[in-house]
Regions:
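Short loop/beta submotifs within extracellular cysteine-rich repeat domains
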Residues: 4-5, 29-33, 50-51, 111, ...
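Short coil/turn segments at secondary-structure boundaries
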Residues: 34-42, 131-132
């Protein structure tokens, strides 16, 4: 039993609802001009740190075109080589590219960003993501499968 399962059993003895990720969150789609981001607010897969260690400043930032906008509280996951376990809970607004999944919560009154980050930074999630990835040399996570990942949704005070 995982630590999360132990806590849920202790704090929610009557059980909790389990839903697919897509029921509580979605991928960011809004685009912004690349000129709106800089080294501290642009997040590419190369500056997400392995083993759930957050991010570092970008060494290169797109000079032209559009990037996918993310907001403070979004969860960014590296979609290339999911076994590297690259994930970050955004502490600012910024932009990213298609190699990073920017997950936005649909309703902050149902799921807190910190709780969702905790669930998605679990070894169970990364094993699921790696199992559903495609490709041999540079596997990519399956965006559809990620949204089908089953997560617990305890009451907000428990989260």
């Amino acid at each position: 039993m995982s630590k999360l399962e132990e806590l849920l059993a202790e704090l929610c003895p009557d059980g909790v609802e389990y839903v697919e990720l897509c029921d509580v969150a979605h991928y960011a789609k809004r685009r912004i001009d690349a000129r709106e981001v800089d080294e501290s607010t642009y997040v590419g897969v190369e500056n997400l740190l392995q083993n759930k260690m957050g991010k570092t400043s970008a060494s290169t930032v797109p000079a032209t075109g559009n990037v996918i906008a993310f907001e403070k509280g979004n969860i960014l996951i590296g979609n290339l080589r999911p076994y590297l376990r690259k994930i970050w809970l955004a502490d600012c607004n910024g932009g990213t590219n298609g190699d990073v999944l920017a997950i936005q919560i649909n309703d902050d009154n149902k799921v807190s960003p910190q709780f969702l980050y905790y669930v998605l930074s679990s070894e169970q999630f990364f094993a699921y993501d790696a199992q559903n990835s495609k490709g041999a040399k540079m596997p990519r996570g399956d965006k559809t499968a990620v949204m089908k990942y089953i997560i617990p949704v305890p009451p907000l005070p428990v989260q």
